[in-house]
């Protein structure tokens, strides 16, 4: 009896020890640290935040001759709503513009001529400034365009983040052709679509970084000279012929080369860009009633701005119309 008691006690102690070890292992497996490491219980990684207007770089191309005639109109209207996102690229210093725009006025060393090299020089400056900004989208417009920031943001948000995007309005109903120089004095005929710069276009950063070998620094002008085409065509050439990308055509961009009167008033708030000018000898503007007369507002941009932003201080109040 005295010999069995220690054996029974030892067995009981051994059983308790095993149970204690199992319990300890169980609690270790359920510790907060282990729960966080369990794949099934991990929180999903949040994706990039939704695109905001401050993620977009808007470049306006102009020249000294249009500083007063065109730019002041833009500064009074849509640029007043996108001042932090908008950069104006010109060929000559302007004290008045400098006071209004500060560092957002970029004076290039480009010629004031309306030639392929001069236009490509300014586009190269726009592209390089965008790359240095770190922003998510590059949008180019001319100084006769009205940009609707709400419609622009709605359009850009619709594109998948993981895709290369080149969106704008082609000016032709067919691809353009170019002769691409080859070794041994040969040439190769290539064809591609491009978005006309006169209506504006946008490129996301993912695509812009891939374009850098042909578009950054002096290489954009070199590429333009190689195919003997202007800046907007060169953009399309790089994207489609060098990178295998594709233009996403959008009817929401407009230039003065189309019949703008065909747009109904109800459609205007949906358009990303609008324009004005003389086409085939006639004034080509959107059809929009008031609040300013055609004599007061020949471009109709001020009336359009009041339609989109009736709270603008210089817009006539609703009760006074």
From Swiss-Prot:
Its cofactor is Mn(2+). It is a single-pass type II membrane protein. The chain crosses the membrane at residues 8-27. Substrate binds at residues 70, 143. Keywords: Developmental protein, Disulfide bond, Glycoprotein, Glycosyltransferase, Golgi apparatus, Manganese, Membrane, Metal-binding, Signal-anchor, Transferase, Transmembrane, Transmembrane helix. The keyword DNA repair does not apply. This is Beta-1,3-N-acetylglucosaminyltransferase manic fringe. It comes from Pan troglodytes (Chimpanzee). The lineage of its organism: Eukaryota, Metazoa, Chordata, Craniata, Vertebrata. The gene is MFNG.
């Amino acid at each position: 009896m005295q010999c069995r008691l220690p054996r029974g006690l030892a067995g009981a102690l051994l059983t308790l020890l095993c149970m204690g070890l199992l319990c300890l292992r169980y609690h270790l497996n359920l510790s907060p640290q282990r729960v966080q490491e369990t794949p099934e219980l991990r929180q999903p990684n949040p994706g990039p935040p939704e695109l905001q207007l401050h993620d977009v770089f808007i470049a306006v191309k102009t020249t000294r001759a249009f500083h007063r005639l065109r730019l002041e109109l833009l500064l009074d209207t849509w640029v007043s709503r996108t001042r932090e996102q908008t950069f104006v690229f010109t060929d000559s210093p302007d004290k008045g513009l400098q006071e209004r725009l500060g560092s957002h006025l970029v004076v290039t060393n480009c010629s004031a001529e309306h030639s392929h090299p001069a236009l490509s020089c300014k586009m190269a400056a726009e592209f390089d400034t965008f790359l240095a900004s770190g922003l998510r989208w590059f949008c180019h417009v001319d100084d006769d365009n009205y940009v609707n920031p709400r419609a622009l943001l709605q359009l850009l948000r619709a594109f998948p983040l993981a895709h290369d995007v080149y969106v704008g309005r082609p000016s032709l109903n067919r691809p353009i052709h170019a002769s691409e120089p080859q070794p041994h004095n040969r040439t190769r005929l290539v064809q591609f679509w491009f978005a006309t710069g006169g209506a504006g276009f946008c490129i996301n950063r993912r695509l812009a970084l891939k374009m850098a070998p042909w578009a950054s620094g002096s290489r954009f002008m070199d590429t333009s000279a190689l195919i003997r085409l202007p800046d907007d065509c060169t953009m399309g050439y790089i994207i489609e012929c060098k990178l295998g990308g594709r233009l996403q055509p959008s009817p929401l961009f407009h230039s003065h080369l189309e019949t703008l009167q065909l747009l109904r008033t109800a459609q205007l708030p949906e358009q990303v860009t609008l324009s004005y000018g003389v086409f085939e000898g006639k004034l080509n503007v959107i059809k929009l009633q008031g609040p300013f007369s055609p004599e007061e507002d020949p471009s109709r941009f001020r009336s359009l701005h009041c339609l989109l932003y009736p709270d603008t201080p210089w817009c006539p109040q609703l009760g006074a119309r």
